[in-house]
Amino acid sequence: MVRRFKRAVKYRRGSRTHGWGRVGQHRKSGGSGGKGMVGFHKHKWSLVMKYGESGTGWPFYGKHGFKQPPTITVEWRPINVGTLAEVVRELKSEGKIREEGGKYVVNLLELGYNKLLGGGSIDVPVIVYTPVASKTAVEKIQRAGGEVRVVAIHR
């Protein structure tokens, strides 16, 4: 941005305080009301009233949350038991799952899912390999004559 004035420092060489009065009046944080968030409940309260949310005073007061690192977070891609029952025969014909002893063997990680939920119903016996399964999903698959085997997620 264009400066429309000359800096006074050029003309104040040798004056020790450069127009700021006594020594120390323009040093450190005393002239600005303190360092950082100091004084927001005292002499800087007008800033809180102007810029903070009414009632909470956010972002000047309160906890502000925590964002987990992406290496810890898992993006869940769930599939319901009912959906699995509908597509299991199609997946067998496509060669994406195999059959052992009259039961279909399904690895959800290979199909792009990492969680098994209990929505819907199933009447086909399946052996499901999954990192996470809900309690109802495990019960429904066991009632249909199958089983759920928990495997680790490789990141």
From Swiss-Prot:
GO biological process, one term: translation
GO cellular component terms, semicolon-separated: cytosolic large ribosomal subunit
Annotated region described as Disordered, given as residue ranges: 1-35
Keywords: Ribonucleoprotein, Ribosomal protein, RNA-binding, rRNA-binding
Record field: compositional bias (Basic residues): 1-16
Single GO MF annotation: rRNA binding
Disulfide bond entries: none
Record bears the keyword Mitochondrion: no
InterPro entries reported for this sequence: Rbsml_uL15_N, Ribosomal_uL15, Ribosomal_uL15/eL18, Ribosomal_uL15/eL18_sf, Ribosomal_uL15_CS
UniProt record similarity statement: Belongs to the universal ribosomal protein uL15 family.
Subunit structure: Part of the 50S ribosomal subunit.
PANTHER family to which the protein is assigned, alphabetical: 60S RIBOSOMAL PROTEIN L27A, LARGE RIBOSOMAL SUBUNIT PROTEIN UL15
Function: Binds to the 23S rRNA.
Protein name in the entry: Large ribosomal subunit protein uL15
Gene: rpl15
